[in-house]
Swiss-Prot record:
Name of the protein this chain belongs to: Quinolinate synthase
Alphabetic keyword roster: 4Fe-4S, Cytoplasm, Iron, Iron-sulfur, Metal-binding, Pyridine nucleotide biosynthesis, Transferase
UniProt keyword Cytoplasm present: yes
Upper classification of the organism: Bacteria, Thermotogati, Thermotogota, Thermotogae, Thermotogales
Catalysed conversion reaction: iminosuccinate + dihydroxyacetone phosphate = quinolinate + phosphate + 2 H2O + H(+)
GO terms (BP aspect): 'de novo' NAD biosynthetic process from L-aspartate
SUPFAM superfamilies for this protein: NadA-like (SSF142754)
Protein's pathway: Cofactor biosynthesis; NAD(+) biosynthesis; quinolinate from iminoaspartate: step 1/1
Gene this chain is encoded by: nadA
Length: 298
């Protein structure tokens, strides 16, 4: 099946982009594997006109927004993000009315319709940097409450999180899990995602996006790392650092990320579906805050 996928990909002129949380078999056939920021940047550099995206819906839509003239397909239309769906355009409009002079910063894990109402987009890799660079001591931030709290800690700014309880179910680790792994692996370094709750972040050695997690073993000579994010990241790290050991903090599985399989990936290439289609108005409006993010990052 892998050979068939690679053959069809080449014949039909597709490039395959996969998120770090995809199953190992899909990461291994992808042309590029990365976090949402890395994938967004990669999508802008591509000369190929056809992209098969392996991730969840908001990520595929992000690729489409940045590449409106390219064909973007996904294997499973139902692969979505519960956290992104917590935030609605109505909530954003309500808070804009309450705080008319406060910039709206939206995490990339949001719907395209919500992005169209934002001032700037951020990812878990650059949220702190983006908010620091805004000329405002207060920001409206959504939809991840934990990432919003982390940004407030790191920037000293007031962060109004919307909706009230927006969070990623996959990253709701327990601080006790860190205590347990420290007993089992006393020399290990613990790295957690900023979507984790504060008690977990506070007990970790490092807090970072999946893209940042990849860089830590380059600088830290530790032999064992405990990883607090979706289980798919372990495969990526083991491939990159075969001489180190990577242990999951908990068995955190995103069922939506796992909806993509070798079978439906092959079917997507055979039928060239399902195509990501967005209204032109949404693409134009959502692109502005995304490009603003790139501007702020330099």
């Amino acid at each position: 099946m892998v050979d068939e996928i690679l053959k069809l990909k080449k014949e039909k002129g597709y490039i395959i982009l996969a998120h770090n949380y995809q199953i190992p078999e899909l990461q291994d056939i992808a042309d590029f594997v990365g976090d949402s920021l890395q994938l967004a940047r990669k999508a802008m550099e591509l000369s190929e006109k056809k992209i098969l995206f392996l991730g969840v819906d908001f990520m595929a839509e992000l690729v489409k927004i940045l590449n409106p003239d390219k064909k973007v397909i996904v294997p499973d239309r139902s692969a979505t993000c519960p956290m992104a769906n917590h935030l609605t355009p109505e909530i954003i409009r309500e808070y804009r009315e309450k705080f008319p002079d406060v910039p709206v910063v939206l995490y990339v894990n949001s719907t395209s319709e919500c992005k169209a109402l934002a001032d700037v987009i951020c990812t878990s890799a650059n949220a702190v940097e983006v908010v620091k660079k805004l000329d405002s001591s207060v920001v409206i931030f959504g939809p991840d409450r934990n990432l919003g709290e982390y940004v407030a800690e790191k920037t000293g700014k007031k962060v109004i999180t919307i909706p009230e309880n927006g969070h990623c179910p996959v990253h709701q680790f327990n601080a006790e899990s860190i205590d347990a792994v420290r007993k089992k692996y006393p020399d290990a370094k613990v790295i957690v995602h900023p979507e984790s709750p504060k008690p977990v972040r506070d007990k970790a050695d490092y807090v970072g996006s999946t893209g940042q997690m990849e860089k830590i073993p380059e600088k830290d000579p530790s032999r064992i790392f405990v990883i607090g994010t979706e289980i798919g990241m372990i495969h990526k790290l083991k491939k990159k650092f075969p001489d180190r050991e990577f242990v999951p903090l908990e068995m955190a599985v995103c069922v939506n990320m796992k909806k993509n399989t070798l079978e439906n990936t092959l079917h997507a290439l055979q039928t060239e579906s399902f195509e990501v289609i967005l209204p032109k108005e949404v693409i134009e409006k959502a692109k502005k805050p995304i490009l603003r993010m790139f501007e702020l990052m330099g």
